[in-house]
Amino acid sequence: MKCSWREGNKIQLLENGEQYYPAVFKAIGEAQERIILETFIWFEDDVGKQLHAALLAAAQRGVKAEVLLDGYGSPDLSDEFVNELTAAGVVFRYYDPRPRLFGMRTNVFRRMHRKIVVIDARIAFIGGLNYSAEHMSSYGPEAKQDYAVRLEGPIVEDILQFELENLPGQSAARRWWRRHHKAEENRQPGEAQVLLVWRDNEEHRDDIERHYLKMLTQARREVIIANAYFFPGYRFLHALRKAARRGVRIKLIIQGEPDMPIVRVGARLLYNYLVKGGVQVFEYRRRPLHGKVALMDDHWATVGSSNLDPLSLSLNLEANVIIHDRHFNQTLRDNLNGIIAADCQQVDETMLPKRTWWNLTKSVLAFHFLRHFPALVGWLPAHTPRLAQVDPPAQPTMETQDRVETENTGVKP
């Protein structure tokens, strides 16, 4: 499948759970024919129970509902919680679940990290939010800052088709060679234009990164990137510095209060390289940053699930939308500049790690390890990801799959 730029869309930025969850639950409540929902994390907390209730009500009124969860991100939903949905007719699947080893999850690589909802081929949501109370301000200091978009218009057809082609039973010809797709060019830039881009482990391995690189090459005035987990490869870092050196104002917002300490360690290894290259780096200090958004000049923007780290850029299944729209760009710009002014600390010379031989050695080793991390993972024994569908009673039937597909004739379509 290859997507093209779609015109005539309605695009709405949604910030955090306070805006995202009511919009999603309302759309589910108004669904008439079909719901497709996939996410990395679904917790059995207050937010998770609201999603459960919305899907249950939809299924009970005859709406066809399908859910795909990641087996690593959502391992602990109770049988009772899931059974109630499957008994009502919800098709409930886990992407590549595996048993724990000494109580530890082992399936950490090549995860299904997308967050997409499609309602009746009319409305779609895509972004970085999971279904967890962690995305609500009421959660406290550890509540996550995140973004998504609500979409209406022709782009929804592309997102629906993408979902349908990745459902079980939809086989695709596999090629022994790897094809690389150029970033889809918008030959007639306008307003309300949206393009779906994704990353998989087949023909679209670096599509999202290619769009970022193309954006940095085309930038003329300003780029703002807000990304939770920032440790891209050398090509990306070089493109950032190159843009800054030709006079583009580059603002990079990263976690200052990370949910994982290693995130700060990794990002700070890059501070010298970025700051001395003219990139303005801001640490978001109010709470953990979980967003994956960016904008360029006055028309280009992206929102989605892809971080800028080795897992998202080289291993996980991800999905973003690229948006050409001045109003949306300005809305996102106002939001990001607002959190820079209110909740960020700019990294200056005093915050840079001292340039000692030890720090330099650590930086070089860490950088090259993370740079080659995906290739190292590729040397591990290969396995074919599996899809587990939960049918009442809740005894998963395992189906071999690669794209999220199956040959089990008993699986619901």
From Swiss-Prot:
GO terms for molecular function: cardiolipin synthase activity; phospholipase D activity. GO terms for biological process: cardiolipin biosynthetic process. Keywords: Cell membrane, Lipid biosynthesis, Lipid metabolism, Membrane, Phospholipid biosynthesis, Phospholipid metabolism, Repeat, Transferase. Disulfide bonds: none annotated. It is a peripheral membrane protein. It comes from the Bacteria. It is found in: Cell membrane. PROSITE patterns: PLD. Belongs to the phospholipase D family. Cardiolipin synthase subfamily. ClsB sub-subfamily. Catalyzes the phosphatidyl group transfer from one phosphatidylglycerol molecule to another to form cardiolipin (CL) (diphosphatidylglycerol) and glycerol. Can also catalyze phosphatidyl group transfer to water to form phosphatidate. All three cardiolipin synthases (ClsA, ClsB and ClsC) contribute to CL synthesis in stationary phase. Only ClsA contributes to synthesis during logarithmic growth phase. This is Cardiolipin synthase B. It comes from Escherichia coli (strain K12).
